[in-house]
UniProtKB/Swiss-Prot annotation:
This is Elongation factor Tu. Mg(2+) binds at residue 26. Its EC number is 3.6.5.3. GTP hydrolase that promotes the GTP-dependent binding of aminoacyl-tRNA to the A-site of ribosomes during protein biosynthesis. Belongs to the TRAFAC class translation factor GTPase superfamily. Classic translation factor GTPase family. EF-Tu/EF-1A subfamily. Residues 173-175 are annotated as: G5. GTP binds at residues 19-26, 81-85, 136-139. Keywords: Cytoplasm, Elongation factor, GTP-binding, Hydrolase, Magnesium, Metal-binding, Nucleotide-binding, Protein biosynthesis. It is found in: Cytoplasm.
Amino acid sequence: MAKESYKRDKPHVNIGTIGHVDHGKTTLTAAITSVLAKQGMATLREFSDIDKAPEERERGITISTAHVEYQTAKRHYAHIDCPGHADYIKNMITGAAQMDGAILVVAGTDGPMPQTREHILLARQVNVPALVVFLNKVDIADPELLELVEMELRELLTEYGFPGDDIPIIKGSALKALEGDPEAEKQIMELMDAVDSYIPQPVRDIDKPFLMPVEDVFSISGRGTVGTGRIERGRIKVGDEVEIVGIKPTAKSVVTGIEMFQKTLDEGQAGDNAGLLLRGVDKNALERGMVIAKPGSITPHTKFKAEVYILKKEEGGRHTPFFNGYRPQFYFRTTDVTGSVTLPEGVEMVMPGDNLSIDVELIAPIAMEESLRFAIREGGRTVGAGSVTKIVE
């Protein structure tokens, strides 16, 4: 019967568990499903079931990710959990699992560890909007130590640009909750209340300003030029003004027709594969890699800072390191653009399997904003992935 209640009448939010290895991320994920399942809000997922996460490919990169869904009284959640540290890095950088917020799991017995730091930094770099902390294993931790751990955590979060003083820190034991201990189950509900109230409701794609990456271009004699692609966000109506951004100087146009599967529409929206007929645009003025967007909503850039992950040899990546001045292609949305890489001071070379911050200068401008994801390619083969962290010019 519980299955029936999975109607999409609640707002949807994507979250995930992050934190150091063995601090209890997967146990917590299982505990959340176990506690909510008792209220008919989830299907119980065993630890072992979540732990052997299936492999997926995202932008040519293999990532193991477990997907769990559940709901609270207020929201419907899709929750991701990764078995390995490298999977988290890849997930966050490729945006395979776009997180609207995350639960940072820290063992009260250990306090913040190196991967705790790395995950907080990554969450900051790839713009995860909000974090809630679950201080785990409090049943076996020294109470005085817990106070120190909490202080240290708040300082660490502040250091990385999160509001450390305001972030909810919920203390509990995921294992005890999973075993059905009533007090520990209450702590899980407390955590979910914090997630409900502290992680902001994301703006739905359809409510964002219109943007469609151009995949293909053709002309209809006597009517004009059509750009086709999948609408990434927002909605578009016949008669709307748009800008064509990237590669060449930005141009303005008006949408005079919208087609989907050979049918004409009045409106296209996020997720639709559509063809847009553009007034007064020459066929040569539109090409793959440009975007058609709401005027003023996005601008073209060539220089940016990025957080990147470089594939290991075993993942199909490079076999050798690269150095300052490396010139691969950067694949944004629908096209490759060559760019040169400047490494951070003190970094001589980058090995396959590394993740780091780099500066990039492209040979042609691309419609860009912070958090935009891209692949790094060499002759069509993916060798890395990245996320724009800051636009320089």
